[in-house]
Each structure stands twice: as C-alpha cells, then as structure tokens.
Amino acid sequence: VEILKGSQSSVYGSGAIGGTINITTKKGTKNQKGDFFYNTGSHGTNNISISKSGEKLNTNYLVSFEKFQTDGISAMSHNEEKDAYRNNSFLGKFDNQFNDYLEIEGTVRLRDTYLQYDKVIDTATATHNEEENGRHYLASGALTYKPNKKFTNKLSLTSSYTKRSYGAAAGSGNSIKDNYYGERYSYGYMGNYNLNLDNSLIFGVEREEDQIGYNKDLTGIKRESYYTTSSFFDYQKRISNNL
C-alpha cells in the first residue's frame, strides 16, 4: 500500500489530482503455492482465507477467497441489539509475458457484504435495526508494449459496478427499502519515454464514464450520468543524483 500526496495525475490519471492510494496486489511466483488461514474470536467472529498462486507457461496467476463475519457488539445504552458484519470476497489475477516486448494482465474482484448499524434516531424506543447489503465487482485489464528499452506504451480498461440496498426494518429509521447503484468505465493510454538516465517524458489520455442510479423508497429508479476526458503531459529531469 502506497499513499501519495499532492497531484499524481501524470501517472495515475485525472482522478488522482489531489493524491492517491496505490494498492498493489500480489503476483503469482514461479513455485506453486497454496495458503490457508483461519482465526476466530469473541462475539462470533470468524475469518477464513484460501489462496492459490503460481506460474505456468510465462503466466503468473493468483486466486484467493476470503470470508469474514462477526455477530458484533451493542454500544447502545437502552437495548442489546448487536451490529453484525459479513464480507465475502474473491480475487483473480493473471499476468502473461508473451515476449520481451508484449505483456498482458488482468484482474477480477468480487465482494458481497452485509452490515448492521445504529442510525441516529431521536426516540429512545427505536430498535436501530438498520442494515445494508452491498455487492461490488471490478474487472480490469492492461496491455503493455515495449518496442525498445526506452519507450513503454500501456493501454488499460477498467469496469466496476456497485449496488447498495438499505433494508426496511421495524423500529428502524428506514421504513421502506432503498437501492443505490453505481457503474464506472475507464479507458486510458499512457506512454513513458526515457530520453536518457536524467530526462523522461510521460504522456497520455484517459476517459471515465460514470452512471449512478437510486431508487429511494421504491418510488422508481432515477439515473444520472457524466463523463470526463483528460490528457496529460509530464517532463521530468534529474539535475544531479541528489536533486
């Protein structure tokens, strides 16, 4: 995990104009490897993780599944209602090095969540039975072409979808179910040309398309959409080894 402050648009696109958190997942290694992890704790807490990684025919791969759940605790002074949480996630990742010039990589991530929480309600008799169901998927792919050691070209495509449903429960602050949806598609090209050891150029273009939908109180889905197209150019020069 890498936290970068300040504008990072020249490297990570227009969405990183105020900074970015760069999370790099593990790649498969040459040796076949399988991992199993399980722990448990109080309040019905259980966590299990299974993963498999390796390399075959110049292709690195990683497949993992994780399940976390807990019954939660009650922080309210007038009832014993606990706030449970569940998170099931799947990750698949591959990287294929065709030759010295061409590489392709892809990632698929799925997540299913359930959350109970206490909403601020001004009545002491409320049971605070708020709950949220969430589903999220992300798929991304990238093609990298290096015609020579100085010039690197990268085409990328990312698609994501999120759905959040807030359930209606007796004594809660939500009397009718609410649904919220979000979709994002991102397309981009980035080029990196190293003129020499001290000078380099970074340039590219990116387009992001966002669509949102909400169905509050089941009154009908309302949709909105927008897009952003951006280009960037960055020249970097190293004056000395320390500057």
Residue ranges and their predicted role:
Residues G15-I17, N39, G44-I48, R86-N88, ...:
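Residues that define the transmembrane beta-barrel architecture of outer-membrane proteins
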Residues S10, N22, K30, S51-E132:
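Periplasmic-side early beta-strands and strand-to-turn transitions of outer-membrane beta-barrels
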Residues A16, K27-T29, G54-N58, L195-L197, ...:
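A generic beta-sheet turn/junction motif
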Residues I3, V11, G15-F37, I48-I50:
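N-terminal periplasmic accessory domains that precede
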Residues G6, T24, F37-H43, E55, ...:
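Outer-membrane beta-barrel pore domains and translocons
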Residues I3-L4, Q32-D35, I73-H78, N88, ...:
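Extracytoplasmic loops and strand-loop junctions of Gram-negative outer membrane beta-barrel proteins
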Residues L62, D95-T113, E130-L243:
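Face-selective signature of the C-terminal outer-membrane beta-barrel domain
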Residues S7, S14, G19-T20, I73, ...:
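Gly/Ser/Thr-rich helix-start
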